[in-house]
From Swiss-Prot:
One of its GO terms (cellular component) is membrane. This is Serpentine receptor class alpha-7. One of its GO terms (biological process) is detection of chemical stimulus involved in sensory perception. Keywords: Membrane, Transmembrane, Transmembrane helix. It is a multi-pass membrane protein. It comes from the Eukaryota. Belongs to the nematode receptor-like protein sra family. It is found in: Membrane. The chain crosses the membrane at residues 25-45, 57-77, 104-124, 143-163, 187-207, 237-257, 273-293. GO terms for molecular function: G protein-coupled receptor activity; olfactory receptor activity. It comes from Caenorhabditis elegans.
């Protein structure tokens, strides 16, 4: 029989499986992409984007949350691969006590919560930019900082709520797993995350439609039309990111729920062969900076192409006015 702080037979079987090891390398690749594209995302948002100051503050907050999760998950993936390659044949594969994992897990949950709540924060900020008439730089800064502080507070307390009153007397293979007495509460929060992502999706669709409708009611004057175009472009980008996050959160939540429902029909090996791929948070974290860079660059290229076409073509007055309208729309 294994000692309490040594891995059990099914933990060892999971570590030694090729499927599990491949999943860790996939996560490591996603983590590397997150770090690389986050650098480019910060650079392009700061220098070349049309985002307002409040949007930039919240985008940077989301990028920090994504990288925080990936950094901690990096340590976990490396530890598990280290155990799989160098400890698998040892008499005792060492586990970590739940108490020792507590600080690590709290920070990890802060990163996850920051990404989910951060997307809601971005949509609220876009709502403020849409409905506040005099959304100047000072107002934008106040909104961005206020929402960012609220997100940080909620993210910090989420981990404490999940692990609240847990005796922390067990042992874990890695610190990305929840303590045994907190598993049910963690599943509840996973469902809440999915609900929030669903709310974000609905809110983003309504907000985008409202902005599009409002654009057509804006008089064809260069200043107002340009500012409205900026709001629509930035809001469309946030809505796109929200949609992607919803898809992966739905896969995570619904996938885990389905597996738990049919758990009795699966062997231990079958269950863990599938469940390892339903943890989609590393995908969400990696796709955020990648898609952010893609959307900003594609928007820029589209505008440059239109302007070049516009300046090279000789037109009548009616054609000129028609193309102007197409540029703004």
């Amino acid at each position: 029989m294994s000692a309490p702080n040594c891995a059990r037979k099914y933990d060892i079987a999971r570590l030694s499986s090729l499927n599990f090891q491949i999943s860790q390398y996939v996560y490591l690749s996603l983590i590397s992409l997150t770090f690389i594209f986050s650098y480019f995302a910060v650079k392009i948002v700061h220098q070349k984007s049309i985002f307002q100051l409040s949007t930039k503050i919240l985008l940077f907050h989301n990028l920090v949350s994504a990288n925080l999760h990936q950094l901690l998950y990096l340590f976990s993936a490396l530890r598990r691969l280290n155990l799989a390659y160098f400890y698998i044949d040892e008499p005792c594969v060492p586990l970590i006590s739940e108490a020792d994992c507590l600080p690590y897990l709290k920070v990890l949950v802060t990163g996850i919560s920051g990404m989910i709540y951060g997307q809601t924060g971005l949509l609220l900020e876009r709502g403020c930019a849409t409905f506040i008439k005099d959304y100047d730089k000072k107002t934008s800064m106040f909104v961005g900082i206020a929402i960012s502080i609220a997100i940080l507070f909620l993210s910090l307390i989420t981990g404490k709520i999940i692990i609240w009153d847990d005796p922390l007397q067990g042992y874990l293979l890695s610190c990305v797993s929840y303590p045994s007495q907190s598993v049910e509460r963690s599943r509840l929060f996973a469902s809440i995350y999915t609900f929030i992502s669903s709310f974000n999706l609905v809110f983003s669709v309504l907000l985008r439609r409202y902005n599009k409708k409002l654009e057509y009611s804006t008089p064809f004057v260069v200043g107002p039309r340009f500012r409205k175009r900026e709001v629509i472009d930035s809001t469309s980008t946030i809505c796109f990111l929200t949609f992607v996050q919803f898809i992966f959160m739905f896969i995570y939540s619904f996938g885990i729920f389905t597996l738990k429902t049919i758990r009795s029909m699966l062997t231990y090996r079958q269950y863990y062969f599938i469940v390892v791929w339903f943890y989609t948070i590393p995908f969400i974290a990696a796709l955020f900076p990648i898609l952010l860079v893609y959307r900003i660059r594609s928007s820029h290229v589209s505008r440059v192409t239109i302007i070049k076409t516009f300046t090279k073509t000789k037109q009548t007055q009616e054609e000129h006015i028609k193309q102007l309208k197409n540029v703004w729309n």
